[in-house]
């Protein structure tokens, strides 16, 4: 999926709001994921999955930091996510559908905290970007 110049600008606008809240928004995204899609909990058997768990907060920050890397390298998402793609495909073996579910939860979190910036056009751009991220994270699956 090709991101237009407008899409890239929209994603960067969203990230200008999100980037200073990585731990909070990341943890909220994961908590929402675990509640709405309980099967995703199976990848975290060693985590305390309760609200505001330090493990969920730390992992949420890590997830959104990786998204931030993709935003910062929006013209080379495959290069920015290559090592993470290897990790998920070869070691963690996360079912690819879970990236799409995470993306849905992240968009809800963005909309909840920044409803005025999540216009239909921005929503489409963010969805295209997140789809590109998910596609790249699963590109090394066999």
Swiss-Prot record:
It holds the Pfam family Globin. GO terms for biological process: hydrogen peroxide catabolic process. Red blood cells. It comes from the Eukaryota. GO terms for molecular function: haptoglobin binding; heme binding; iron ion binding; organic acid binding; oxygen binding; oxygen carrier activity; peroxidase activity. Keywords: Heme, Iron, Metal-binding, Oxygen transport, Transport. Residues 2-142 form the Globin domain. Gene3D superfamilies: Globins. Heme b binds at residue 88. O2 binds at residue 59. One of its GO terms (cellular component) is haptoglobin-hemoglobin complex. Tetramer of alpha-1, alpha-2 and two identical beta chains. Hemoglobin A is the major, and hemoglobin D the minor hemoglobin of this species. Belongs to the globin family. Involved in oxygen transport from the lung to the various peripheral tissues. This is Hemoglobin A subunit alpha-2.
């Amino acid at each position: 999926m090709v991101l237009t110049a407008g899409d890239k600008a929209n994603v960067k606008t969203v990230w200008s709001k999100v980037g200073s809240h990585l731990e909070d928004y990341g943890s909220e995204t994961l908590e929402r994921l675990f509640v709405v899609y309980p099967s995703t909990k199976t990848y975290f058997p060693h985590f305390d999955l309760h609200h505001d768990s330090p493990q969920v907060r730390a992992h949420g920050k890590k997830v959104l930091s990786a998204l931030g890397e993709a935003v910062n390298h929006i013209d080379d998402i495959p290069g920015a996510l290559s090592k993470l793609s290897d990790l998920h495909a070869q070691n963690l073996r996360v079912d690819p559908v879970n990236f799409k579910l995470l993306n849905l939860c992240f968009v809800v979190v963005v909309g909840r905290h920044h409803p005025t910036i999540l216009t239909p056009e921005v929503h489409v751009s963010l969805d295209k970007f997140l789809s590109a991220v998910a596609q790249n994270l699963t590109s090394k699956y066999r």
